[in-house]
A protein has these predicted regions:
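Short, well-ordered beta-strand segments in beta-rich or mixed alpha/beta enzyme
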Residues: 2-9, 40-70
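Non-catalytic surface loops within mature trypsin-like serine protease
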Residues: 10-12, 60, 96-99
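Short amphipathic alpha-helical segments
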Residues: 12-38, 76-81
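Intrinsically disordered, low-complexity acidic/polar segments
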Residues: 15-17, 63-65, 101-102
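Alpha-helix boundary recognition
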Residues: 23, 31, 65-68, 86
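Glycine-rich beta-strand-turn "strand-cap" elements at beta-sheet edges
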Residues: 40-49, 77-102
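A short hydrophobic/aromatic micro-motif that marks alpha-helical segments and, especially, helix-coil
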Residues: 58, 74-77
């Protein structure tokens, strides 16, 4: 199993709207992609910003490519991301899941 980690930040005032937007875009598309085994959306408020981490679980790199395309280490963005995100990584990280009790 592989965990894909994507991160970005919004203004705290946009945090709830961005979360709902994530559910309608990236999270929905993750869940509709064959080989996806779940998604965690994490949020942490720091001063006037909210940091988001999206952790998605996949059965293989090929499954991730089904979502992200052949250049699967690049972050996937949606049309209104620029409206919300004040900081974001252009690349994501992938980790092999060695153990999970969830």
């Amino acid at each position: 199993m592989i965990m894909r980690i994507c991160k970005g930040s919004t203004h705290r005032s946009d945090s709830d709207s961005y979360f709902n937007y994530l559910l309608e875009t990236g999270v929905k598309e993750y869940r509709e992609t064959t080989g996806n085994h779940g998604v965690y959306v994490l949020r942490r408020n720091v001063d006037d910003h909210s940091e988001f981490l999206l952790l998605s679980l996949w059965d293989s790199v090929e499954s991730i490519k089904g979502f992200a395309g052949s250049d699967y280490e690049k972050a996937v963005f949606y049309p209104e991301d620029a409206k919300y995100l004040v900081e974001f990584d252009k690349h994501v990280a992938h980790f092999e899941v060695l153990y999970s009790s969830v």
